[in-house]
């Protein structure tokens, strides 16, 4: 690394140290990461859909290298992959950067990022571009590898992605069975499962749709309790809106929908989840018989699908991985 680049990184570290808010410092402590790295990562997340994040992710990678933090280096590589994943129109780049993340994760013994890139980016990319059979083929290949290596982290990602695939294929019962397997594996071996809140939220949606309110409430409570990020919290809240809408408690649904709307306005990191918000908003308006507003929300949802190049997917689905 050149002397000039080291000086530039030093300046970035200094500036971040000055402006890091107390909340970010606290979150950095929770995740056991240097606060300046975490603050810069949050800035990357705010620009995840913009080309500038490509250079920012490179900077994050070198900042992490200066700190000898291989985990944040993997995060930086994953952030670059995230950009191409969300663009949705450059398969070669998704495949290439998936391979880069997997290679680095393999070399540094970080299976979490190895399977994240494979499942939550490459396979989900195939799903969101309407190729569920290719996604299933990749998932089965990944499952075989995780089973052969007896890699519990890999199995978690496999079970989760299987649930996504069968949800897309409208095999809801099979999808819920895979989610249950993911939860059981997590609890049995006390595994770190950063996104398990999303799994509980999805399971709650299944119970809501299949008129099992008691099970839905239990899953929703667990989704809230296990939320680790702003995206987890918003998805849990949206699942609650669906539950209230289905059960006819429209005042509660409207109140929580308003809270969600405010969170989206306040936090740019949630931008890629707006499609999910509009889907829930449309469902609420349909159930409360506000059909003109329901149509408007559906049109906004479709516009988001076009923006994220996810129009090939079922409108109920996504934003629920990776994340990273």
Language-model regions: role of each:
Residues 145-229:
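Solenoidal tandem-repeat scaffolds enriched in leucines and small polar residues
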Residues 28-38, 51, 92, 176, ...:
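Hydrophobic positions within repeat-based interaction scaffolds
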Residues 46-59, 88-100, 130-141, 171-181, ...:
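Helix-turn-helix repeat elements of alpha-solenoid scaffolds
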Residues 58-65, 99-106, 140-147, 180-191, ...:
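Amphipathic alpha-helical segments of tetratricopeptide repeats
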Residues 31, 71, 112-114, 153, ...:
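Residue signature of alpha-solenoid helical repeat architecture, marking inter-repeat boundaries
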Residues 37-49, 75-89, 116-130, 157-170, ...:
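Tandem amphipathic alpha-helical repeat scaffolds
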Residues 2, 22-78, 88-92, 111:
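N-terminal leader/linker segments that initiate helical-solenoid repeat arrays
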Residues 10-18:
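Bacterial N-terminal signal peptides
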């Amino acid at each position: 690394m050149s002397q000039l680049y080291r000086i530039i990184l030093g300046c970035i570290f200094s500036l971040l140290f000055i402006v890091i808010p107390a909340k970010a410092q606290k979150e950095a402590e929770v995740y056991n990461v240097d606060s300046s790295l975490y603050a810069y990562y949050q800035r990357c997340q705010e620009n995840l859909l913009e080309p500038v994040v490509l250079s920012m992710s490179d900077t994050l990678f070198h900042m992490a290298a200066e700190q000898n933090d291989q985990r944040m280096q993997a995060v930086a590589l994953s952030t670059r992959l995230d950009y191409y994943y969300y663009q949705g129109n450059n398969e070669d780049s998704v495949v290439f950067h998936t391979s880069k993340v997997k290679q680095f994760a393999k070399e540094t013994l970080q299976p979490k990022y190895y399977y994240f890139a494979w499942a939550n980016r490459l396979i989900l990319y195939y799903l969101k571009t309407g190729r569920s059979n290719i996604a299933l083929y990749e998932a089965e290949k990944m499952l075989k590898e995780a089973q052969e290596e007896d890699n519990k982290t890999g199995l978690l990602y496999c079970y989760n992605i299987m649930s996504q695939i069968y949800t897309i294929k409208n095999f809801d019962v099979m999808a819920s069975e895979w989610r249950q397997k993911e939860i059981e594996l997590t609890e049995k071996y006390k595994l770190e499962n950063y996104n398990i809140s999303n799994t509980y939220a999805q399971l709650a949606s299944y119970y809501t749709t299949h008129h099992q309110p008691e099970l839905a409430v239990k899953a929703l409570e667990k989704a809230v309790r296990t939320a680790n990020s702003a995206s987890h919290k918003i998805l849990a809240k949206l699942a609650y809106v669906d539950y209230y809408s289905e059960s006819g408690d429209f005042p509660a649904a409207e109140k929580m929908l308003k809270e969600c709307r405010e969170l989206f306005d306040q936090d740019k990191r949630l931008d890629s989840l707006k499609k999910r918000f509009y889907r829930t908003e449309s469902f609420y308006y349909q159930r409360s018989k506000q059909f003109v507003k329901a149509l408007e929300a559906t049109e906004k949802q479709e516009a988001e699908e076009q923006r994220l190049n996810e129009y090939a997917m079922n409108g109920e689905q996504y934003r629920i991985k990776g994340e990273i």
